[in-house]
A protein has these predicted regions:
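Residue-level detector of extended alpha-helical repeat arrays and alpha-solenoid scaffolds
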Residues: 81-82, 119, 151-152, 251, ...
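Amphipathic alpha-helical scaffolding segments comprising HEAT/armadillo-like alpha-solenoid repeats
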Residues: 32-35, 59-73, 94-112, 130-144, ...
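A structural signal for short beta-strand/turn segments enriched in small hydrophobics and glycine
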Residues: 194-206, 232-241
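Core register positions within helices of long alpha-helical scaffolds
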Residues: 88, 125-128, 157-160, 164, ...
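Short beta-strand-turn/beta-hairpin segments enriched in glycine/proline and small hydrophobics
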Residues: 171-187, 202-225, 243-244
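Short histidine-centered loop motifs in beta-beta connectors
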Residues: 181-196, 225-234
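N-terminal intrinsically disordered, acidic low-complexity segments at the extreme N-terminus
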Residues: 1-29
């Protein structure tokens, strides 16, 4: 029995497939030109490279040579470079690196630097070596800094010097930040209560007839928004517009310091963190209990 053959009709776009079926003839594939390939791979490489370069330039863990450290400490155009150098300094100091002493005068100089984040990091760094000449006095002056975070870090560092002069500032680290409206007007934008916020994070915007643009209200501390006036709310200058609870790390460091220098008067600020609540971590709760116990033991109170 002969097997009939099948062929495509003349002039059609069909062809016979290996299984004997017919179908449209596949269109020829268009390959990218050399220029297109170069552009494609270059774009892909940049997509990967640019975030890496940003991370590399902002990551404070990247090691700096002695020359780079000196340059970064004086880079007024890039305050984050100064912060990077201070973090590296603190690490060297904590490991008793004698070579780090050559930059100690720079740490004292930066104690009144105009950028808050630099002063904040500087206060922490000076606490890494209690033998640093001039550090103690510089930290005492920083207790009067306009920034609550700088005051707090200076107070924490002073504890390493066995100096409890900053105890009120340490207790303040346990308390929420109350933010008042700088102008009278109405809220046009605001974040939601319960939202985590970093230091300097935007909380709300207030518009008034006297200003061409809304005034931004920012958080002075890292933490979580407890309350904030919502859009449409009228506010008057000096009235409370937001409350931010301190972050876990800040609270934990303050409790550790008060374990050493706390007094009975500080217990009302400590005991809220002893509660078994979802927003209080086990580490913080345990530290609060230990701090409470240590303070009462020093005072001879059961």
């Amino acid at each position: 029995m002969s097997i009939p053959s099948y062929s495509a009709a003349p002039g059609s776009d069909s062809q016979i497939h290996p299984d004997g079926s017919t179908g449209p003839e596949p269109k020829p594939k268009h390959s990218m030109s050399r220029t297109q390939k170069i552009l494609f791979f270059t774009t892909g490489w940049l997509i990967v490279l640019m975030p890496f370069l940003f991370w590399w330039n902002t990551w404070f863990g990247r090691h700096l040579s002695n020359q780079q450290l000196t340059e970064y400490l004086h880079d007024d155009k890039k305050p984050r470079h100064i912060q990077h150098a201070l973090v590296q300094m603190g690490d060297r100091m904590s490991h008793a690196d004698v070579a780090a002493k050559q930059w100690y005068p720079e740490l004292i100089r930066l104690a009144d630097y105009p950028v808050e984040q630099v002063r904040n990091t500087d206060a922490w760094a000076m606490g890494q070596d209690t033998s640093g000449a001039g550090f103690h006095q510089a930290l005492l002056k920083m207790l009067a800094d306009p920034s609550p975070m700088v005051r707090g870090n200076a107070a924490l560092s002073l504890v390493r010097f066995a100096d409890a002069a900053g105890r009120p500032q340490i207790v303040a680290l346990l308390q929420p930040a109350m933010i008042d409206a700088p102008i009278s007007g109405h809220v046009v934008d605001a974040d939601r209560p319960g939202t985590a916020v970093h230091q300097g994070g935007l909380l709300a915007k207030v518009a008034s007839a006297d200003s061409s643009a809304p005034v931004e209200i920012r958080s002075p501390i890292p933490g979580r928004i407890r309350s904030v006036s919502q859009p449409g709310t009228n506010v008057v200058v000096g009235a409370e517009i937001a409350v931010v609870d301190p972050g876990t790390e800040q609270v934990w460091e303050a409790l550790r310091a008060l374990y050493l220098v706390g007094q009975l008067d500080d217990l009302p600020a400590i005991r809220p963190y002893e509660r078994d609540l979802p927003d209080i971590s086990n580490d913080v709760r345990q530290q609060a209990l230990e701090t409470d116990k240590a303070i009462r033991a020093r005072a001879g109170v059961n």
